[in-house]
Curated annotation (Swiss-Prot):
Membrane topology: Peripheral membrane protein
GO BP annotations, alphabetical order: carbohydrate transport; glycerophosphodiester transmembrane transport
Family to which this protein belongs: Belongs to the ABC transporter superfamily. sn-glycerol-3-phosphate importer (TC 3.A.1.1.3) family.
Any one GO MF annotation of this record: ATP hydrolysis activity
Name of the molecule in the record: sn-glycerol-3-phosphate import ATP-binding protein UgpC
Alphabetized SUPFAM superfamilies for the sequence: MOP-like, P-loop containing nucleoside triphosphate hydrolases
Organism: Rhodopseudomonas palustris (strain BisB5)
Amino acid sequence: MANVVLRNVRKTYPGGFEAIKGVDLEVGDGQFCVLVGPSGCGKSTLLRMVAGLETITAGEIDIGGRVVNDVEPADRDIAMVFQNYALYPHMSVYNNMAYGLRNRGMAKPEIEARVQEAARILEIGAMLDRKPRQLSGGQRQRVAMGRAIVRQPKVFLFDEPLSNLDAKLRVAMRVEIRKLQRRLSTTAIYVTHDQLEAMTLADILVVMNAGQVEQIGSPLDVYAKPATTFVASFIGAPPMNLIPLDAEGVRARFGGAVTEAGVLGVRPEDLAISSEPPAPGGLTLDLAVEAIERVGPETFVYGTRSPGGDLAAISSKPGELPPDEIIIRIPGQEAPAIGQRISVVALRHNLHLFSADGRRRIAV
C-alpha cells in the first residue's frame, strides 16, 4: 500500500497542445480516488502518466514516497485494469493470471498460492481451466482484476473497466470492485466518465475538465457544494438547473434584495410544486410544463420559465425572460399536465450562486 502524490503535473504534446495543465492531487494510503469528467478532459492521460505509460512534461509523481517520473512502468509497483480486459485468448484463466508472475521469476508454489487466493476472492475458482472466449464479459473483467490482484501492488489503476458491460452487469461489478478494494485496503485510482459510477465508488472525487481539476472532495461534498457551474452541471442526474442572472439583465430577488450578475443554481429535487410562497429568502419560479418523464419511484417535470416569480427582468424589455428549461424531480407518479402553468419554490439554503463566468461559488 502507498499514497500517491501529484505535484503540478503537466503534459504537453508536440505542437503545443497542453493535455494536463498543472494538476495537484494527493491520494492517501488505502483510499479510492475517482477521476471523472467528459471525454477528452485528460483523466485517462493523467492515469497513464501515473502508470508510466505517458511521459511527464513537468511536475512530479510520487508513489509511496518515491518520485517515479523516470521509473519504468514495471518497476512502479502498480497494477492496471483496462476497459478491454487485455487477456491472452490462447491462455487459460489460470495462465492469464499467472503469466506476469512467471515473467518475474516467482517460484511456482508462490504463484499457485496467489492465483488460488485471487480466484477465491473473485469467486472464479471453477473457471481457472477455461479460455477467455468461454467467459461472459463480467467474468472476463473478474479475470482482469485477478491478474492485477496477484501482483499484490501498492496501487491499483482502473481505466474505465466497466465501459464494455451492459447496465445491469455494470452495477454488479461496481459493487464488487468497491468491496474488493475495501477488503484489500489497496490504494486505487479509477477513471470514468460516468458520474453515478464516480459518486458510488469514490472516497475522493476529482472532477476534471479541459486538462485541469475543477474540484476535489468527497462525493457528497462535491454534490452539495459544487465549486463551479461545470461541476454543478456534470455531477448529478438530471443536472443542476442553472439560470444566468446576467442574461438580458435578468436578476433574482432574495428577501426583497436583487442579486448582482451571476449564475443561479438549484437541484431538481430541491424544487417543489406549490401555490404557497417559500420561507423568507426562498425562490419562486413560474413555469409552463412541456414534458413529463415517469421512471417509477419518481417523476421528472420539464418546464420553461415564464414571467413572474422571483426572477425579474430589469433590462430594456421588462417582463421578458430568456426561455431557459427547468427540471423538477418529484417523488411518485403524480404530475401536472403538459401545457399547465405551475409555480415551483425552493428554500434559500438549497440555492447556489456562482460568479458570472461560472468559475467561483458565491454564498447566497
